[in-house]
Amino acid sequence: MLLTLVLLPLVGIALVSTTHWNNPIVVNKDGSIVSTNVDPDAKAKYIALLISIITFVFSLSLLVLFDPSTPEYQFTYAFGNKEALNTVFTSDFQLGVDGVSLYFVVLTTFLFPISFLASWKMKSAESDQYNVKFYLCTLFVLETLLILVFIVTDILLFYIFFESVLIPLFLIVGIWGGSPNRVRAAFLLFLFTLMGSLFMLLSILALYYNVGSTDFNMIHQYAIDTNVQKLLWVGIFISMATKFPLWPLYSWLYRAHAEAPVAGSILLAGIVLKMATYGSLRLLLQFLPDASYYFSPLVQTLGVMSVIYASLVTLRQTDFKVLVAYSSVGHMGIVVLGLFSNSIQGVEGSIILSIAHGLVSPALFMLVGSVLYDRFHTRTIRYYRGLVNYMPLFSVFFFLFTIANAGVPITGNWIGEVLCMMGAYQMNPIAATLTASGIVLSAAYSIWLFNRITFGTYSNYLNYTTDMNRREFNVILPLFVLTLLVGLAPNLIIDNIDISVSSLLY
């Protein structure tokens, strides 16, 4: 099943790359040239959307067939003969999912149909007929790599796919970004995260030297000396702290978000940052538990500083996308606080908050980076006022996702934040209390933002416009429904991850 899940996006690449480009320029019999409104890339877009939906539906079968009563890897698949592979690679190309990785796989496959719909207005110029097809294929490559990050059961392969994700991200930001600064933002994204991951590579090589294997199960069963754990932990944590990102390693994130196309922002906030959550769970908490406990006060301090600093900086932002990007830094700080609380509630809360953030943040990027920007072509907050008069449906959804981002009850963010705070309070009451103040600040900037752009007289800087169309509504509605579902029925997630989390910690 997992092999099929990996191959489906590759099938999408093959189909999209072979579609015919429909020239929107028509030459009449009299020699006159007429430009039509036909989208020349419509066929490729429909194929990409269909394949991504099939991939998502197929991933749901994993959710239905998953057995939550065991912490073992399920739906496992091994490539070829193990002994033959070991003579060349010293690692096993095996696939499998457990409760920790299951929902990250489903979240990945869910966000790609959303991303394809969000990119629907992109068109190829006549001088570059392959631009959109290349873009769609790049998204499929990114989906394949992200799925592999969450399902490989070998630490060396995990590192390879973890870093390979940077290549399509670099292309998405650098080629299809929104301004001339996109190339600089793409290089900053690539180099910043790559430099952090070099330390993880050194730790993985040292881990192989000590254990003699890169297989997850073998590493988990091996008793590593505590002092060695600490050295390995530092190298891996630097990479994860850059990817979350934590203060002070966040500067690449808001620049990448500001320049990325809306689909790039959706995927970057929705699932790419969650690789750090999964990597911390798997590599730090599971393989290096003694070192994780030893360094937890330091990590929780960084988490608290990230929450408070990001919330304060967000209050001063004038750019929509940068504001939402900084709010992501704050939420991931709470995730870190729960991860290193050494409690089941905290770790489960961090997973739920990661999933909820992977729904709310993409919705906000869609609303401000696509719905508003496509109409008014500016992300400057001070230009907006009185949108409720002409865009009531947008205003309703923007209000709902703004308060969800602030962590109000019956939303997934609230459940995740409460569990993270409960777990953190047991270990570090001061850190939990300070983080609560950061959550109050997040409510402050959320309410200010909604009030600023929605109410009052309509801004003189803006042209009169229409409300959300059907495509935009179809993108936002599933995100809203799932956000409520996670908030109202968190047991749907907790029941499937409880045994795996308990086994991971104890």
Give the ranges of each region predicted by the language model.
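Alpha-helical transmembrane segments of multipass membrane proteins
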Residues: 13-18, 60, 116-117, 144-148, ...
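Alpha-helical multi-pass transmembrane bundles of energy-transducing inner-membrane proteins
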Residues: 23-25, 29, 39-44, 72, ...
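Structural signature of hydrophobic alpha-helical transmembrane segments
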Residues: 1-8, 97-108, 155-168, 229-240, ...
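C-terminal ends of transmembrane helices
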Residues: 14-35, 113-126, 171-181, 244-258, ...
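Predominantly late transmembrane helices and immediately cytosolic-facing juxtamembrane segments
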Residues: 361-365, 430-464
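Acidic, glycine-rich loop-and-beta core segments that form the ion-binding/anion-interacting portion
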Residues: 254-256, 261-263, 273-358
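Transmembrane helix-loop-helix hairpins at membrane boundaries of multipass inner-membrane proteins
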Residues: 1, 15-137, 502
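Juxtamembrane/interfacial segments at transmembrane-helix boundaries in multi-pass membrane proteins
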Residues: 67-92, 181-184, 197-251, 255-258, ...
